[in-house]
Amino acid sequence: MLNGYGENCRGKNHGNFKTILLIILTKKEEDMTIQIELISASELADESFNIVINDLKPRETYRVEMYLTDYYCINAPMLLAHDVLWKSVATFVSNENGIINISQTPSCSGSYEGISTMGLFFNAKPLTNMRKKLPNSLSKIPLLDHFFMEIKIMQGNTVIAEKTFTRHYMSSQISHQDIYGKHFQGRLFYDKKAIKTPALIIVSGSEGRVEKAQNIAQLLSSRGYICLAVAYFGLEGLPKHLERIPLECLVEAKDYLRQHPQVDSERIGIYGRSKGAELVLAEESLFNDVQCLVLNSPSDVVYEGIKGKWNSHTSSWTHLQKELPYQKFRLGDYLFSKFFRKTFPKDCSARIDIGQIHSPILLLGSAVDEIWDASSAIDDIVSHYKGHYITFKKYHETGHMLTVAYQPNHRYRKDWRLLMKESKDSWLATIHFFDRHLKKQ
């Protein structure tokens, strides 16, 4: 029996695996003990994992269902309730030894087909579009640092085995603290035992809030950094809209980290994505005093601010209470660029002075970014950079949402395998770049 990938749906032997994390469920089915094994390098949500089901009947069809609860997905709409149930399903045929090995046994039907270790997880979808109002205050924003994954093994309508286990965005040794500055609010993630540790500031996009930034900060803090997830508007005590945001929000965040007793003040980096990357570039063109920058889906010009759903007729950013020159939003230019797939001219006065930045830079972006032309921005940043080290990666499937490895991304109607590959590649590039420039060899 062949599937669309030319693989035998009766599967293969699961081979020899080093089980680093093993979860075993036992349940009697006609005097057989069914075992479910989860194999992963760690419990962190940005690590791949394999599922092996042993002691099934040989050459039988089984349905594997995955349910995610309390799952925060960085790629999902901001208003999607985090307690919405996510689900994926795949049908497998056990091999002659009664084994289903997700990394080797092809899925014959369901949420995906063929062989993919993370196919079941990446193809999970929310069962409803239930939305929740976002909290107005930092203290009321949940940590969202873990989620539960339930695996059910089905034959027909009968559950013959099931197990729930936990995946984490944040390692158990990491603590957190809410920080309230004059121009920013943030959530600090740190190991209480850390000494002279490199630190990162994480700034997310045009939502301005802390949820997406903290998701990234939790994972990076679990990899040996003190991380400050920064909110720069949209919360009580901060500007209401993305307009006239003081660059001093980043200056203040950097000063906070430099004074932190556990931080090595000579090893600080910044991660900015989307509008946050624009903010980082604008600020660093005036105060280039960190050791490295990762800019995800960047812009090399200052764009007009946003007030609700409309353009604000002001700059996005200020310095010393003075607006930075900005590129005005013109609907005609925008429609022209989308219809003809050509870039519209950039206002020279709104260009960020990249030549003033000497920190090492990693640029990540898409050649098919649906929000703005990140690809040409990367080209312009590289051409105007006068420092000693700059590198970039461009992707051709994923658009503006290049985020955390393996997290479901249903924004794009593309080959999900390529979307997953690009999310993994861009995330690993981020980790390796920070490690290279901030961790002592």
Language model features with spans:
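C-terminal catalytic histidine-bearing segment of alpha/beta-hydrolase fold enzymes
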Residues: G387-Q441
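Hydrolase active-site cap/lid region
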Residues: L281-K338
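N-terminal cap/lid segment of alpha/beta-hydrolase-fold proteins
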Residues: L38-L44, F49, L143, F148-I195
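Alpha/beta-hydrolase active-site loop
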Residues: H241-P261, A282
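Short substrate-entry loop that stabilizes the transition state in hydrolases
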Residues: I195-T197, I202-P239, E370-A374
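Alpha/beta-hydrolase fold nucleophile elbow
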Residues: V263-S274
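Short beta-strand/loop motif that positions the catalytic acidic residue
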Residues: I357, L363-G365
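Short alpha-helix in the alpha/beta-hydrolase fold that links the catalytic acid
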Residues: D373-H384
